[in-house]
Swiss-Prot record:
GO molecular function: beta-catenin binding; phosphatidylinositol-4,5-bisphosphate binding
Region listing for Disordered, in residue ranges: 236-259
Assembly and oligomerization: The exocyst complex is composed of Sec3/Exoc1, Sec5/Exoc2, Sec6/Exoc3, Sec8/Exoc4, Sec10/Exoc5, Sec15/Exoc6, Exo70/Exoc7 and Exo84/Exoc8.
Gene Ontology biological process terms from the UniProt entry: exocytosis; neurotransmitter secretion; protein transport; synaptic assembly at neuromuscular junction; synaptic vesicle docking; synaptic vesicle targeting; vesicle-mediated transport
Any one GO cellular component localisation term in the record: terminal bouton
Role this protein plays: Required for exocytosis. Thought to function in intracellular vesicle targeting and docking before SNARE complex formation.
Gene: Exo70
Keywords assigned: Exocytosis, Phosphoprotein, Protein transport, Transport
Protein name in the entry: Exocyst complex component 7
Superkingdom of this protein's organism: Eukaryota
Pfam families linked to this entry: Exo70_C, Exo70_N
Assigned protein family: Belongs to the EXO70 family.
């Protein structure tokens, strides 16, 4: 049964496979027929395409040739139109060119110039003998001239010198944003854009415009400075009003011009110090403590010893810097960068020249003042020099090398004037001129401190406020630099201390000449005591002034024994003064030479000796007291010390003489000779140096 089932299954599978094989064979036959048919179709299609290509290709080639002809025709027409436009451009733009450009619509005029330039290029290359070339060239040149005139007109129309008050705002309000002062920006943005467009067109077409711009804007700077200068002459100096910065804001208290200047230069000095500090900290990692700098010496005394003309000049110098910074900012918006240096140099030249010439005039005037012994002008020079030095970083940033060299003349003029002032002051102290520092040749009758001494001390005290600039001036003198080298061989000094040492050398020379002058002047007195007291007054005043102002520490850099020398000189003068009493005391000092009284009596021949001794003492003492009551010793301690020394020196000698001989009967009229008791001598000595006694 199982075998039967297996056979049946095998039979069924065989039949099924036979059926599938027949079906596959049938399909293969059909595929072969289809392939044969497709091959026939493709062969026919290929033949037909070949026939079509043979038909279409000539048409295509003909069409391509027609297209080329059309393109050539269009190009020819365009060329003809272009050529015709070149011939017509003269008539087309003639009226526009002669009318000139219109502000705010410059592009139309520039388009017309572009057409003329193209026509000019065409005729120049294709028909150089054509009359049309002359026409377009003439019109183009006329247009360029009109454009240049329009450029100049725009600059003139929108450029006006700053009013003095506006310029003073720019000077005094250094750190404020310029956006607050849009009224200063006379050239609006649209005007700047138009000027920029014209500048670049003229630059590309090799036309001159830099001189026009530099001349017009340079005139603005120059006129602004001249108006400021006139304003300073006409206005009450030191109280110029500033414009209100913001409406509705409470007005600030008025400051004097000098105070504003001080504030500006203090800011500059602080900026320099901060920049130096940051540099050192970044390079070394160490922080530094603020040392004395320019700003430390820009005190109110600077303003007192300053010269108004110099302060006005500093305002001019600051004004020039602000104006030129302003011009640089404007120039960036108008002039191509490649022309900046050239334009700025021309623009700034006249203004810088004005400032330099003003410096020459001021320094000449100050030299005349110094020749008249007006020493505040000399101190003003040093103050101005200090401030000009503070301006150097701004000058380096603002000006090109040639302009910096031009402005160096200001610095050199001030340095030269300062050197002349120092030199002339020494000459005056030496007494080489016909008059002394106060213009008088007489010494004071009361032998008080001579005005030469007080003025010399006043001057050198004020010099200390400017030791930095004075040191730089003196360093250029080989005599001072040599002495400084000698000091440095003994002791190393930092740069700031070197400037102080140079000033100390100068003060040492001034004091030496002053001492010599005082010594010579004391010879004008006939009385020896007055001579010594005159010198003592002056030497004591010098020493106390040096000690009070701490200048003694400065002078010690150049002369370590200065204080000791003056103290020794005072001691010697006091001793010399005490010796002037010797003539009066010589007759009563040596008791051994006098007759010895016995029971209150002396021999008849000795009476005349005692009369003579008492009489001579009385006469000399009264004469000395009379003279010295008219002498003034201003210093209380010195005056009382000398009185005390006189009492200690004279009274004991007189007392001994008085006690022995006052009771001796050597005259019928003893009161005629024994005129003074001990307390009366003491009272008279206490009234010395007091003319009212």
């Amino acid at each position: 049964m199982n075998n039967l089932d297996s056979s049946l299954q095998a039979h069924n599978k065989l039949e099924k496979e036979a059926t599938n094989l027949a079906l596959l064979k049938d399909r293969v036959d059909k595929y072969h027929d289809l392939s044969t048919q497709m091959s026939s179709i493709l062969t026919i299609f290929e033949k037909r395409l070949g026939n079509l290509e043979q038909t279409i290709l000539p048409v295509y080639q003909e069409t391509e040739q027609l297209q080329k002809r059309q393109q050539n025709l269009e190009a020819t027409l365009n060329c003809l139109e272009s050529v015709l436009s070149h011939y017509d451009v003269s008539q087309e733009v003639c009226q526009l060119i002669h009318q000139g450009p219109v502000e705010g619509n410059i592009s139309v005029f520039l388009d017309a110039l572009a057409k003329l330039r193209d026509a000019n290029d065409y005729f120049r290359h294709n028909n150089s003998q054509s009359v049309e070339l002359e026409n377009v060239t003439s019109l183009f040149n006329t247009g360029c001239e009109g454009l240049s005139q329009h450029y100049s007109m725009l600059l003139k129309k929108h450029s006006a010198p700053l009013k003095p008050v506006e310029l003073l705002d720019l000077i005094y309000i250094e750190d404020d944003s310029s956006d607050e002062y849009t009224s200063f920006r006379q050239l609006s943005q649209t005007t700047r854009e138009e000027l920029y467009t014209i500048s670049h067109w003229l630059e590309q077409n090799l036309r001159e415009y830099t001189n026009i711009y530099a001349t017009e804007r340079g005139e603005v700077v120059l006129r602004s400075l001249q108006l400021l200068k006139d304003h300073q002459k006409s206005n009450s100096w030191g109280h110029e009003a500033l414009r209100p910065r913001h409406s509705g804001r409470q007005t600030e208290p008025k400051k004097t011009t000098s105070a504003r200047l001080q504030q500006i230069f203090e800011k500059k000095a602080n900026k320099l110090y901060l920049r130096a500090t940051q540099t050192i900290e970044q390079s070394t990692g160490f922080s530094i403590k603020k040392a004395s700098s320019h700003s430390d010496h820009l005190t109110s005394e600077d303003l007192m010893d300053g010269d108004q003309e110099l302060d006005k000049y500093l305002v001019m110098l600051l004004g020039l810097q602000r104006l030129l910074n302003w011009e640089r900012a404007i120039m960036i918006d108008i002039i191509p960068q490649s022309k900046h240096n050239e334009v700025f140099a021309t623009l700034a030249y006249n203004a810088i020249d004005l400032v330099v010439k003003d410096a020459e005039a001021i320094t000449q005037r100050i030299l005349r003042c110094i020749s008249r012994k007006e020493w505040t002008s000399a101190l003003g020079i040093f103050s101005a020099l200090k401030r000009v030095i503070l301006l150097q970083p701004d000058i380096d940033r603002t000006y090109d090398p040639a302009q910096r060299e031009q402005l160096k003349k200001v610095l050199k003029k001030l340095q030269h004037t300062g050197a002349k002032a120092l030199e002339h002051f020494l000459d005056v102290v030496k007494g080489e001129s016909s008059t002394n520092i106060v213009g008088q040749s007489n010494v004071p009758k009361d032998a008080t401190v001579h005005e030469l001494t007080s003025n010399t001390i006043w001057f050198i005290e004020h010099l200390y406020d400017h030791f930095d600039v004075i040191g730089s001036i003196l360093a250029q003198d080989v005599l001072y630099s040599t002495q400084l080298d000698t000091i440095l061989m003994k002791k190393a000094l930092p740069v700031e201390e070197r400037n102080k040492a140079l000033l100390a050398i100068y003060i040492k020379k001034a004091l030496a000449e002053l001492n010599l002058s005082i010594m010579n002047k004391c010879e004008q007195y006939n009385d020896q005591a007055t001579k010594h007291l005159f010198r003592l007054n002056n030497i004591h005043y010098i020493l106390k002034s040096l000690q009070r102002s701490n200048l003694i520490d400065l002078v010690t850099l150049a002369e370590p024994e200065c204080e000791h020398s003056y103290m020794e000189m005072i001691r010697e003068l006091k001793a010399s003064y005490q010796k002037t009493w010797s003539k009066m005391l010589v007759g009563i000092y040596s008791l051994d030479e006098l007759p010895k009284p016995v029971a209150g009596k002396v021999k008849d021949k000795d009476r005349s000796v005692l009369k003579e001794r008492f009489s001579n003492f009385n006469k000399d003492f009264e004469e000395a007291c009379k003279i010295q009551r008219g002498i003034s010793i201003p210093d209380v301690i010195l005056r009382e010390g000398i009185k005390r020394d006189n009492v200690e020196h004279i009274l004991p000698i007189y007392n001994r003489f008085y006690e022995i001989y006052s009771g001796v009967h050597f005259s019928k009229n003893p009161d005629k000779y024994v005129k003074y008791r001990q307390h009366e001598i003491n009272a008279m000595l206490s009234k010395l140096f007091d003319d009212s006694a």
